[in-house]
């Protein structure tokens, strides 16, 4: 099964080798037909500490790195 790849914005880089990435998705409400934006935060592994708050990044699923990290940053 292929690994999922998501695109989002770095919202926090305060932790060592970890960034928090906010991923936004858009969909139409099934009844109202209005476009709705929802976002979810993922903690991703950043071994070189190269990404800063506000950067657009792509993250990919990986094996668990810690209790809360299941994603790794692949592209800036």
UniProtKB/Swiss-Prot annotation:
One Gene Ontology MF term: structural constituent of ribosome
Comp. bias (Basic residues): 34-43
SUPFAM superfamilies xrefs: Nucleic acid-binding proteins
Region of interest (Disordered), residue spans: 34-54
Record field: transmembrane: none
Keywords: Ribonucleoprotein, Ribosomal protein, RNA-binding, rRNA-binding
One biological process term in Gene Ontology: translation
InterPro entries named among the record's database cross-references: NA-bd_OB-fold, Ribosomal_uS17, Ribosomal_uS17_bact/chlr
GO cellular component, one term: cytosolic small ribosomal subunit
Source taxon at top rank: Bacteria
Family named by the database record: Belongs to the universal ribosomal protein uS17 family.
Subunit structure: Part of the 30S ribosomal subunit.
Chain's role: One of the primary rRNA binding proteins, it binds specifically to the 5'-end of 16S ribosomal RNA.
Family annotation (NCBIfam families): PRK05610.1 (NF004123), uS17_bact (TIGR03635)
HAMAP family in the record: Ribosomal_uS17_B
Annotated protein name in UniProt: Small ribosomal subunit protein uS17
């Amino acid at each position: 099964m292929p690994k999922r790849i998501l695109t989002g914005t770095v919202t926090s880089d305060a932790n060592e080798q970890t960034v928090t990435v906010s991923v936004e998705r858009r969909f139409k409400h099934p009844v109202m037909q209005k476009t709705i934006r929802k976002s979810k935060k993922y903690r991703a592994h950043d071994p070189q500490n190269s990404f800063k708050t506000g950067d657009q990044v792509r993250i990919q699923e990986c094996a668990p790195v810690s209790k809360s990290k299941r994603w790794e940053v692949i592209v800036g």
